[in-house]
Amino acid sequence: MIQELPFKDRPIVPIIKDELVEGVWPQFMKPFPLNEKYFLVACKPAKDALWGIYLVDVFDNLTLIAEQEGEGLTAPIPLVKRETPPVIPSKIKPDSKEATVFIQDIYEGEGTQGVPRGTIKALRIFAYEYAYILAPSDHDAQGIQSGWDIKRILGTVPVEEDGSALFTIPANTPISIQPLDKDGAAIQWMRSWLTGMPGEIVSCVGCHEDQNSIPIPKRTIASAKQARRLETPEGGVRPFTFRLEVQPVLDRNCVSCHNGKNAEPDFRKDQMVTYKRGILTKINKQYDQSYLNLHPYVYRQGPESDIYVLKPAEFHASNSELIRILQAGHHGVEVPEEDMRTLYAWIDLNAPYYGAFTQIDLKPQSPKGQVERRMELAEKYSGVRVDWQKEIADYADWLKENKKADGITGATTGETVEIKKPTKPVRPVKVKGFPFDTQTATARQAAKDETTRRLTITPDVHIDLVWIPAGSFVMGNNRTPSASPAFKANVKEGFWMSTTEITNEQFRALFPEHDSRYIGQTWKDHTTPGYAANRPKQPVVRVSWDEANAFCQKISEISGNTVSLPTETQWEWAARSGSADDFWFGSTESDFGAFENLADSTTVDLAVTGVDPKPMRANDPMRKFWDFLPKILNVNDHQLISCPVASYQPNPWGLYDMNGNVAEWTASDYIPYPLKEKANKEAVEKKVVRGGSWRERPKYSTSAIRKAYLPWQRPMNVGFRIIVEDM
């Protein structure tokens, strides 16, 4: 806001709040500027006044032009006599039931900035079906942290090599588009929709391009072909429902172990739980316990989030613990590609449960028969008839006919997924002189004449370094799939390592345009973008491997030293600082509160409620549903999200936050242990990320744990630290 009119001298306080102007007078609607100083506007000057047309100026004058008793005048439009303008020929074909969409280059625009060409293989097209009049609908209408509306997957369409696409969609239907990678996971989310008129050609330059962008003067592959028809999903177009889409995946792959007979999450179907929002509400919902047990392992934006354009892959499936566990190898389970694609779609659609509207006629004042009436009117006036209830029923029948619904047979093999167990025991690895205690670690480090150094970025911004001596150790372990088998690793030369993760202040000293942004809240009615992750002393995040290396290159040019990311071998050696345990301070069962910022009891405050959301009360009946992030409840590290670096105790070599706060990029390619494979550099796509973060539990934050991301990804909980080898 630049200035409020009237009240030109009243200071502007930037407040974001639902019902901000409730009880505030005068109230205004639909201002129409006459020139720089005068405006026609609909105004209600007081609670008991009429809505009328007023002339408002920059001199604080409010002059009534017209009002009418019993009426509200709300649309001031000045008219002037003029010649009839040229008639623009119609761009629609009223009898058509389709529209055409043309995307010139999906890699153009802020939404896919930095995504390498060739990454996007297809587009997922889905349609929204909105709620009914006075029927129960809210941000939890479709699930926990899911959304308001039904999402119907219409199909997919390939993207051409040059990034172009030309395809048909149903006319008069609100559709949304998601660009997919080779695995079928969305790289970006379109958080709005478009609607094509019958016969219309809808076009855009790219993905969330600037509104002032003009088409690029080039011929595209798609424009030289016929518009493609959508490839409809197997089983037909239908709303995405947990019970019919995801539960069969759990039945085939998970319930042989996750069956309620142990401490693991129970993924069996038909274990129903009642969800009731608020003491006075009459709306009771039923959720499968399997849904409530699975969705906490999915990272997603929820019904509302920061309105800033999302970084590409912000909510990519690889950011979800569920997918990382499965990709790393979970107790020998190899989930078929078809089932993985189903999980990706579930995540990309915000992890819904219902995919339907329930209890439509619950409220006494709700019009009856709305479902049929909507179809009748939609068909009459737009030629579209969406019977989402029938689509769900038809798909359920299709599942039964194809023996995919009950987990009795597998999706493609005719059997439940086989769990592959190790065929032979793995021998323990021993390294002479390892492990060693804190006293020995300190002594090894002290053998260097000087153990601390400082790199200067600007006169006011520095990076502190500490010396890490050479040595040998047991790298990895034989318990974690991604970190096995354990093997002897050698760090032949000592090196200098930054004592902390690179901070926002340090990174912005060289890349001032970078913004680590915010961590989103759950619930809705947000009054801020979220919890700040961009304060000066917090570790930089949403920074790609490529950008981390660019930072190292600039520091090298400034200092004259060779600055780089550590290899994962250097990183683990430094993190262990002599320890063979999960952490330098103990095991995954240890109290980490004084040592690392991990997922602890403070994360309960991520469960919020209300207008201007605040943490839920401990006795709130909804808290058990919304306090879902996996955590260690008996530890308190006193930090909700990432915190200023060096807030906890350092390890014996003076390194802070190695296992927590945020995870860290390394220089290494993600190849199997024991790292002897001569990797084809072009074939290795991902880079290794080490350590854990504020939203991860100890077992996923150990010194041995490995994660992997594409070098252009900018995860919200990954940063980096640097090493220098030749100071």
Language-model-detected regions and their locations in the chain:
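Structural motif
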Residues: M1, D48-Y54
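Surface-exposed loop and turn segments in beta-propeller and other repeat-based domains
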Residues: I2-V21, E71-L73
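Beta-rich catalytic cores
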Residues: Q27, A49, G72
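Residue position within the beta-strands of beta-propeller blades
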Residues: F39-A42
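A short glycine-rich, aromatic-capped structural motif
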Residues: R454-Q521, V543-D546, G660, D726
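Functional-site microenvironments in short loops/helix caps that host divalent-cation chemistry
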Residues: V474, R479, D525-K537, R542-I705, ...
